[in-house]
């Protein structure tokens, strides 16, 4: 979003009166194949976030007991089948919501599948499958509506919907997670894990909102804006209009 604010819209995206024009993908079939490949890659990312073998015995107070299990990156026990189920439910919810809200637009339908996955990612290992389905649908509605509102209001040309799918849906997913999973432990290795011997904070709405602000704005939008400004000043950000 920070880069797009500096980059500006494509030539012809907005009329002389400022109204946005719809510029569809050049090759809808290639878009379809590409997004299906992204689904597959995202599932691979999910699988890679699981530590295959981990002895949780000592960390759960079971001294002398060996308890091997898969865990997520926060050392919370999980299963590949469980996260795959929620992955597919959020994908399905996203596809359904995208088809309905975009009135069958293929680009938005398939992009919404990815938005659904991303929106439910924050609590994927803890959500009930129906929660994943519903959260995926909610994320798509938010991403779709925000995309067109930002486009009209700020003249931001998000050509491939990346800001909507990853940014708006991702931010919403973190905030939703804080409410749905309020009180759940943030890590399986939370007891006495802090430097002073205290525990990690449990999942809560305020913490997730602050985390979303840090992730998307402090680490994302602001650095992107600064880098784009520097590149633009050097004449390296966009191909000259004459070209």
Give short role names for the model-derived ranges.
Residues 1-243:
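Glycine- and aromatic-enriched membrane alpha-helices
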